[in-house]
Amino acid sequence: MVSQSLSYIRIGCTSNAELKALKPALKELRKCMPDIYPMLFLRDYSRLKTMFESGHIDIMLVTKDMIENTDCTFKPIKNMKSYALISDDYNKTTEDNKDLHSMSAISFDDLKGHCLLLLNQRLIPFTQGNLLQEKLVLHSQDNYHFICENSQTSELLAQCGYGIAILPEFCIDSPLDNCRILPITDQREIQYGIAYNKTRSTKDTKKICNILISNLKPQ
């Protein structure tokens, strides 16, 4: 029988990798607050932010950049970077003939001449002055790139050798078969965490956020 006191918490995120990362946190939430039922929303950032600001979701998994200038509380979980995904079958070298598969990190100089698989910016918005975004814009002026509408498409095309995918850590469905994941050197770390609305939050909202923060396991 369903409890008459059942209530809901609406949680939004932008990638399948984040949904997987929520698994241990939601298990703990069910143990600690069994009358709270999570409703999960997977949307692109633009729609997610609109839902958040209009009160249609209670909690978002976000980077701090994503919720800049909004009336919310941000609780950090970890600092994250973006990565280059390179298939084991991708046999091109850098312009100076370095083997991409022998590298432990990669720079935009190394990426010259390569097709990049990029996410639509509405999925991973950047603030003005973001070094990685500036490098991506410069790269696209002289090199071919392909815009993907979700992270799964980007990962798939990278695994099939169509190019090198550039993805933020929270979008990578790790581990990936036959694919190397290399940190990009030309960037700054971004703060990733949980946001909730200051004015609409309750004691339950804050307690749920603490449970999520303590148990969320990003890839």
Residues covered by each model-derived region:
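Short beta-strand-to-loop elements that line the ligand-binding cleft
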Residues: 37-44, 140-150
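Beta->alpha turn/N-cap motifs
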Residues: 44-45, 61-66, 87-88, 150, ...
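A late-sequence structural motif
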Residues: 21, 180-219
